[in-house]
Protein backbone atom coordinates (compact mmCIF):
# COMPACT_ATOMS: atom_id res chain seq x y z
CA UNK A 1 0.00 0.00 0.00
CA UNK A 2 1.34 3.42 -0.93
CA UNK A 3 1.98 5.25 2.33
CA UNK A 4 2.22 8.97 2.91
CA UNK A 5 3.67 10.72 5.93
CA UNK A 6 3.47 14.26 7.17
CA UNK A 7 5.52 16.74 5.13
CA UNK A 8 9.01 17.40 6.43
CA UNK A 9 10.24 20.97 6.58
CA UNK A 10 13.06 21.61 4.15
CA UNK A 11 16.26 22.12 6.13
CA UNK A 12 18.63 22.74 3.22
CA UNK A 13 18.66 25.87 1.12
CA UNK A 14 18.34 25.07 -2.59
CA UNK A 15 20.26 26.99 -5.24
CA UNK A 16 17.56 28.35 -7.55
CA UNK A 17 19.95 28.02 -10.49
CA UNK A 18 19.71 24.24 -10.16
CA UNK A 19 15.99 24.24 -10.89
CA UNK A 20 16.24 24.36 -14.65
CA UNK A 21 13.67 22.15 -16.27
CA UNK A 22 10.03 21.34 -15.57
CA UNK A 23 7.98 19.51 -18.19
CA UNK A 24 4.31 19.60 -19.13
CA UNK A 25 3.50 16.31 -20.82
CA UNK A 26 0.05 16.22 -22.41
CA UNK A 27 -1.38 13.20 -24.21
CA UNK A 28 -2.68 14.13 -27.69
CA UNK A 29 -6.01 12.39 -27.12
CA UNK A 30 -8.12 15.54 -27.32
CA UNK A 31 -8.15 19.23 -26.41
CA UNK A 32 -7.14 20.62 -23.02
CA UNK A 33 -9.82 20.66 -20.32
CA UNK A 34 -9.90 22.10 -16.81
CA UNK A 35 -8.15 19.08 -15.30
CA UNK A 36 -5.22 19.18 -17.71
CA UNK A 37 -5.08 22.98 -17.43
CA UNK A 38 -4.57 22.66 -13.66
CA UNK A 39 -1.57 20.37 -14.24
CA UNK A 40 -0.16 22.68 -16.92
CA UNK A 41 -0.64 25.76 -14.76
CA UNK A 42 1.03 24.20 -11.71
CA UNK A 43 4.11 23.13 -13.67
CA UNK A 44 4.31 26.48 -15.48
CA UNK A 45 4.00 28.47 -12.25
CA UNK A 46 6.62 26.32 -10.55
CA UNK A 47 9.08 26.89 -13.39
CA UNK A 48 8.54 30.64 -13.36
CA UNK A 49 8.64 30.86 -9.56
CA UNK A 50 12.10 29.25 -9.56
CA UNK A 51 13.44 31.04 -12.63
CA UNK A 52 13.58 27.76 -14.55
CA UNK A 53 12.60 26.54 -17.99
CA UNK A 54 9.19 25.10 -18.85
CA UNK A 55 9.33 22.35 -21.45
CA UNK A 56 6.46 20.76 -23.36
CA UNK A 57 6.64 17.12 -24.42
CA UNK A 58 3.80 15.49 -26.34
CA UNK A 59 3.40 11.97 -24.98
CA UNK A 60 2.09 10.35 -28.14
CA UNK A 61 3.70 6.96 -27.59
CA UNK A 62 0.23 5.37 -27.18
CA UNK A 63 -0.69 5.45 -30.85
CA UNK A 64 -4.12 3.84 -30.48
CA UNK A 65 -5.44 6.74 -28.37
CA UNK A 66 -3.96 9.65 -30.31
CA UNK A 67 -6.36 12.02 -32.04
CA UNK A 68 -5.18 13.67 -35.24
CA UNK A 69 -4.54 17.38 -34.70
CA UNK A 70 -4.95 17.23 -30.92
CA UNK A 71 -1.31 18.14 -30.34
CA UNK A 72 -1.63 21.32 -32.40
CA UNK A 73 -4.83 22.26 -30.56
CA UNK A 74 -3.14 21.72 -27.18
CA UNK A 75 -0.16 23.89 -28.11
CA UNK A 76 -2.41 26.65 -29.44
CA UNK A 77 -4.49 26.58 -26.23
CA UNK A 78 -1.39 26.90 -24.06
CA UNK A 79 -0.28 29.95 -26.02
CA UNK A 80 -3.75 31.52 -25.87
CA UNK A 81 -3.58 31.14 -22.09
CA UNK A 82 -0.25 32.96 -22.00
CA UNK A 83 1.86 29.87 -21.30
CA UNK A 84 4.83 29.92 -23.68
CA UNK A 85 7.24 27.02 -23.48
CA UNK A 86 11.03 27.20 -23.63
CA UNK A 87 12.95 25.50 -26.43
CA UNK A 88 11.42 23.11 -28.93
CA UNK A 89 8.39 20.94 -28.31
CA UNK A 90 9.29 17.24 -28.38
CA UNK A 91 7.18 14.23 -29.39
CA UNK A 92 7.79 10.80 -27.91
CA UNK A 93 7.29 9.09 -31.26
CA UNK A 94 10.45 10.84 -32.44
CA UNK A 95 12.49 9.42 -29.56
CA UNK A 96 12.08 5.66 -29.92
CA UNK A 97 15.83 5.11 -30.43
CA UNK A 98 16.35 6.33 -26.86
CA UNK A 99 13.85 3.78 -25.56
CA UNK A 100 15.55 1.00 -27.54
CA UNK A 101 18.88 1.95 -25.96
CA UNK A 102 17.35 1.96 -22.46
CA UNK A 103 15.79 -1.45 -23.04
CA UNK A 104 19.17 -2.82 -24.10
CA UNK A 105 20.65 -1.45 -20.87
CA UNK A 106 17.93 -3.28 -18.92
CA UNK A 107 18.31 -6.54 -20.85
CA UNK A 108 19.37 -8.62 -17.84
CA UNK A 109 16.35 -7.44 -15.84
CA UNK A 110 13.65 -7.83 -18.50
CA UNK A 111 11.74 -10.95 -19.54
CA UNK A 112 8.98 -11.75 -22.05
CA UNK A 113 5.46 -12.20 -20.72
CA UNK A 114 2.91 -14.26 -22.63
CA UNK A 115 -0.06 -13.59 -20.35
CA UNK A 116 -3.24 -12.07 -21.70
CA UNK A 117 -5.14 -9.53 -19.65
CA UNK A 118 -7.77 -12.16 -18.91
CA UNK A 119 -5.18 -14.63 -17.64
CA UNK A 120 -3.59 -12.01 -15.41
CA UNK A 121 -6.99 -10.98 -14.05
CA UNK A 122 -7.89 -14.61 -13.30
CA UNK A 123 -4.56 -15.17 -11.51
CA UNK A 124 -5.02 -12.00 -9.48
CA UNK A 125 -8.54 -13.05 -8.51
CA UNK A 126 -7.26 -16.40 -7.23
CA UNK A 127 -4.45 -14.70 -5.28
CA UNK A 128 -6.89 -12.20 -3.80
CA UNK A 129 -9.11 -15.04 -2.61
CA UNK A 130 -6.14 -16.74 -0.96
CA UNK A 131 -4.21 -13.78 0.44
CA UNK A 132 -6.56 -10.81 0.62
CA UNK A 133 -7.64 -7.98 -1.66
CA UNK A 134 -4.21 -6.32 -1.91
CA UNK A 135 -2.83 -9.33 -3.77
CA UNK A 136 -5.06 -8.52 -6.73
CA UNK A 137 -2.93 -5.43 -7.46
CA UNK A 138 0.29 -7.37 -8.00
CA UNK A 139 1.41 -9.19 -11.14
CA UNK A 140 1.66 -12.83 -10.00
CA UNK A 141 4.96 -13.54 -11.81
CA UNK A 142 3.51 -16.22 -14.07
CA UNK A 143 6.19 -15.85 -16.78
CA UNK A 144 9.07 -14.80 -14.55
CA UNK A 145 10.84 -18.17 -14.80
CA UNK A 146 10.17 -18.50 -18.53
CA UNK A 147 7.32 -18.87 -20.99
CA UNK A 148 5.14 -21.93 -20.56
CA UNK A 149 5.00 -24.37 -23.51
CA UNK A 150 2.83 -22.94 -26.27
CA UNK A 151 3.00 -19.41 -24.88
CA UNK A 152 4.01 -16.61 -27.23
CA UNK A 153 5.82 -13.54 -25.91
CA UNK A 154 3.53 -10.52 -25.74
CA UNK A 155 4.78 -7.82 -23.40
CA UNK A 156 8.17 -7.26 -21.78
CA UNK A 157 8.28 -6.98 -17.99
CA UNK A 158 10.92 -5.62 -15.64
CA UNK A 159 11.86 -7.81 -12.68
CA UNK A 160 11.45 -6.27 -9.27
CA UNK A 161 13.54 -7.61 -6.36
CA UNK A 162 12.00 -10.62 -4.61
CA UNK A 163 13.99 -10.80 -1.37
CA UNK A 164 14.44 -8.56 0.40
CA UNK A 165 11.41 -6.49 -0.45
CA UNK A 166 12.29 -3.31 -2.29
CA UNK A 167 10.72 -0.25 -0.66
CA UNK A 168 11.08 2.93 -2.69
CA UNK A 169 10.56 6.23 -0.90
CA UNK A 170 10.72 9.87 -1.86
CA UNK A 171 9.82 13.28 -0.49
CA UNK A 172 6.90 14.71 -2.43
CA UNK A 173 6.78 18.48 -2.12
CA UNK A 174 2.99 18.46 -1.68
CA UNK A 175 2.23 15.17 0.09
CA UNK A 176 5.36 14.69 2.18
CA UNK A 177 7.11 11.34 2.54
CA UNK A 178 5.75 8.64 0.21
CA UNK A 179 6.81 4.99 0.28
CA UNK A 180 5.85 1.93 -1.73
CA UNK A 181 6.96 -1.68 -1.54
CA UNK A 182 7.18 -2.32 -5.27
CA UNK A 183 7.94 -6.00 -4.71
CA UNK A 184 4.67 -6.78 -2.94
CA UNK A 185 2.46 -3.90 -4.09
CA UNK A 186 3.32 -3.77 -7.80
CA UNK A 187 5.40 -6.75 -8.84
CA UNK A 188 7.14 -7.06 -12.19
CA UNK A 189 5.78 -4.29 -14.42
CA UNK A 190 5.51 -3.78 -18.16
CA UNK A 191 8.13 -1.74 -20.01
CA UNK A 192 6.97 -2.66 -23.53
CA UNK A 193 3.35 -3.48 -24.17
CA UNK A 194 1.85 -6.41 -26.04
CA UNK A 195 0.77 -4.08 -28.87
CA UNK A 196 4.39 -3.02 -29.40
CA UNK A 197 4.03 0.45 -27.88
CA UNK A 198 6.43 1.57 -25.18
CA UNK A 199 5.02 1.59 -21.67
CA UNK A 200 4.55 4.98 -20.04
CA UNK A 201 6.89 4.19 -17.14
CA UNK A 202 9.94 3.54 -19.32
CA UNK A 203 9.32 6.29 -21.88
CA UNK A 204 8.81 9.03 -19.31
CA UNK A 205 11.90 8.07 -17.30
CA UNK A 206 14.11 7.99 -20.39
CA UNK A 207 12.79 11.33 -21.63
CA UNK A 208 13.14 13.03 -18.25
CA UNK A 209 16.74 11.86 -18.05
CA UNK A 210 17.59 12.85 -21.63
CA UNK A 211 16.08 16.33 -21.19
CA UNK A 212 17.76 16.96 -17.85
CA UNK A 213 14.46 17.35 -16.01
CA UNK A 214 15.11 18.53 -12.46
CA UNK A 215 11.54 18.99 -11.16
CA UNK A 216 8.29 17.25 -12.06
CA UNK A 217 4.95 18.85 -11.20
CA UNK A 218 1.90 16.79 -12.17
CA UNK A 219 -1.41 15.38 -10.96
CA UNK A 220 -1.72 13.20 -7.87
CA UNK A 221 -3.18 10.40 -9.99
CA UNK A 222 0.44 9.67 -10.96
CA UNK A 223 1.71 9.53 -7.37
CA UNK A 224 1.44 5.74 -7.39
CA UNK A 225 3.61 5.53 -10.54
CA UNK A 226 6.50 7.49 -9.09
CA UNK A 227 8.19 4.65 -7.13
CA UNK A 228 8.37 2.56 -10.31
CA UNK A 229 9.93 5.49 -12.12
CA UNK A 230 12.45 5.98 -9.32
CA UNK A 231 13.36 2.30 -9.54
CA UNK A 232 13.90 2.60 -13.30
CA UNK A 233 16.04 5.68 -12.72
CA UNK A 234 18.21 3.65 -10.35
CA UNK A 235 18.68 0.86 -12.88
CA UNK A 236 19.47 3.28 -15.72
CA UNK A 237 21.83 5.41 -13.64
CA UNK A 238 19.68 8.52 -13.98
CA UNK A 239 19.30 11.28 -11.37
CA UNK A 240 16.10 11.57 -9.36
CA UNK A 241 14.10 14.76 -10.00
CA UNK A 242 12.09 16.46 -7.27
CA UNK A 243 8.37 15.67 -7.41
CA UNK A 244 5.24 17.65 -6.62
CA UNK A 245 1.84 16.04 -7.18
CA UNK A 246 -1.06 18.48 -7.13
CA UNK A 247 -4.68 17.43 -6.47
CA UNK A 248 -6.69 16.32 -9.49
CA UNK A 249 -9.99 17.85 -10.56
CA UNK A 250 -12.97 15.52 -10.08
CA UNK A 251 -16.30 15.40 -11.89
CA UNK A 252 -19.69 15.32 -10.17
CA UNK A 253 -19.40 11.55 -9.71
CA UNK A 254 -16.09 11.85 -7.90
CA UNK A 255 -14.07 10.57 -10.86
CA UNK A 256 -10.92 12.20 -12.16
CA UNK A 257 -11.92 14.76 -14.77
CA UNK A 258 -10.65 13.45 -18.09
CA UNK A 259 -11.67 13.02 -21.68
CA UNK A 260 -12.94 9.54 -20.76
CA UNK A 261 -15.20 10.95 -18.02
CA UNK A 262 -16.75 13.68 -20.14
CA UNK A 263 -14.40 16.62 -19.62
CA UNK A 264 -15.17 19.48 -21.99
CA UNK A 265 -12.59 21.60 -23.79
CA UNK A 266 -12.30 25.08 -22.30
CA UNK A 267 -10.75 26.71 -25.37
CA UNK A 268 -13.51 27.06 -27.94
CA UNK A 269 -12.14 30.17 -29.60
CA UNK A 270 -13.69 32.55 -27.09
CA UNK A 271 -11.98 35.79 -26.08
CA UNK A 272 -9.55 36.45 -23.27
CA UNK A 273 -12.29 37.43 -20.83
CA UNK A 274 -13.93 34.01 -21.22
CA UNK A 275 -10.60 32.21 -20.87
CA UNK A 276 -9.98 34.05 -17.62
CA UNK A 277 -13.47 33.57 -16.24
CA UNK A 278 -14.02 29.94 -17.23
CA UNK A 279 -10.52 28.45 -17.29
CA UNK A 280 -7.57 30.32 -15.78
CA UNK A 281 -9.20 31.78 -12.68
CA UNK A 282 -11.05 28.54 -11.78
CA UNK A 283 -7.82 26.55 -12.25
CA UNK A 284 -5.94 28.98 -10.01
CA UNK A 285 -8.65 28.78 -7.34
CA UNK A 286 -8.53 24.98 -7.47
CA UNK A 287 -4.79 25.16 -6.74
CA UNK A 288 -5.51 27.38 -3.74
CA UNK A 289 -4.41 30.68 -5.30
CA UNK A 290 -6.41 33.81 -4.45
CA UNK A 291 -5.93 35.59 -7.77
CA UNK A 292 -8.02 38.23 -9.50
CA UNK A 293 -7.18 39.73 -12.89
CA UNK A 294 -8.81 41.23 -15.96
CA UNK A 295 -6.01 40.47 -18.45
CA UNK A 296 -3.54 37.67 -19.15
CA UNK A 297 -0.46 39.68 -18.11
CA UNK A 298 -2.16 40.73 -14.89
CA UNK A 299 -3.18 37.14 -14.19
CA UNK A 300 0.34 35.75 -14.46
CA UNK A 301 1.85 38.69 -12.59
CA UNK A 302 -0.44 37.83 -9.68
CA UNK A 303 -0.34 34.03 -9.99
CA UNK A 304 3.44 33.53 -9.85
CA UNK A 305 3.98 35.25 -6.47
CA UNK A 306 0.78 33.62 -5.18
CA UNK A 307 2.25 30.21 -6.06
CA UNK A 308 5.47 31.09 -4.24
CA UNK A 309 3.51 32.05 -1.13
CA UNK A 310 1.47 28.85 -1.25
CA UNK A 311 4.54 26.66 -1.49
CA UNK A 312 6.33 28.50 1.30
CA UNK A 313 3.28 28.05 3.53
CA UNK A 314 3.48 24.31 2.83
CA UNK A 315 7.29 24.16 3.27
CA UNK A 316 7.34 22.98 -0.34
CA UNK A 317 9.23 25.71 -2.19
Where are these regions (language model features)?
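Catalytic adenosine-cofactor/nucleotide-binding cores of aminoacyl-tRNA synthetases and other
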Residues: 116, 224-225, 235-317
Amino acid sequence: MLTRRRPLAHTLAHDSASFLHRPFRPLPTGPLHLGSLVAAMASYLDAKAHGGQWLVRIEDVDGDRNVAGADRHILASLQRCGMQWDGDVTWQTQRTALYDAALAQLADSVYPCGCSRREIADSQTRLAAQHGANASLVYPGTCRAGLAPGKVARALRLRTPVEPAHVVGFQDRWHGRVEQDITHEVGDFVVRRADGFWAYQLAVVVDDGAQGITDIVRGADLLDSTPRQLYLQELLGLPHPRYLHVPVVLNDDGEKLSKQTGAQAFDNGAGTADLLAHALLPAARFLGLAVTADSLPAFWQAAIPAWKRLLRERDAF
